[in-house]
Amino acid sequence: MKMFKSLRLLPHIVSPFQKCYSTDLISLVGVPRVKITKGQNRYLLVNIHTHGFTKYGRVIVRGADVDNHLAVFDSILEELEPEGICAKILGGGRILNEAENKKIKIYGTSRTFGGADHTRTRNILQAWTTYKDFKITVKQ
């Protein structure tokens, strides 16, 4: 009898693990962590997650040579919404990407979304294979 009572608890134990490995969460892995252009960029540091699974998010960097950070945010939404992925902006700033000299400078803040953690942005860029050999400086 005790065994049957224990088996009744099994769905409550297994359910959290099923959420961790949901196919919805696997779609986050397909989103590139970094997308920036050469030259002067306005960038956003973004936490992405599938709807309902905010605990299992991923932080990405998106930047473009545009007039304001809102245009970068609009492009992020165009990219992620069809996949069913939600975005929370952690802050923004500017990135000067000198690809020919292998240098990147991260600085400034976004008037719309506030300042990003530039050190975290640098760590994400350094982990990305394209920018691992670049000299990345952060100016607060």
Swiss-Prot record:
One protein family per Pfam: Ocnus
Task performed by this protein: JanA and janB regulate somatic sex differentiation.
Similarity comment text for this entry: Belongs to the janus family.
SUPFAM superfamilies: PHP14-like
Domain of life: Eukaryota
Mutagenesis / variant outcome for changing residue 49 to N: In strain: ZBMEL131
Keywords from the named record: Differentiation, Sexual differentiation
Protein's UniProt keywords contain Lyase: no
Transmembrane regions listed in the UniProt entry: none
Name listed for the protein in its UniProt record: Sex-regulated protein janus-B
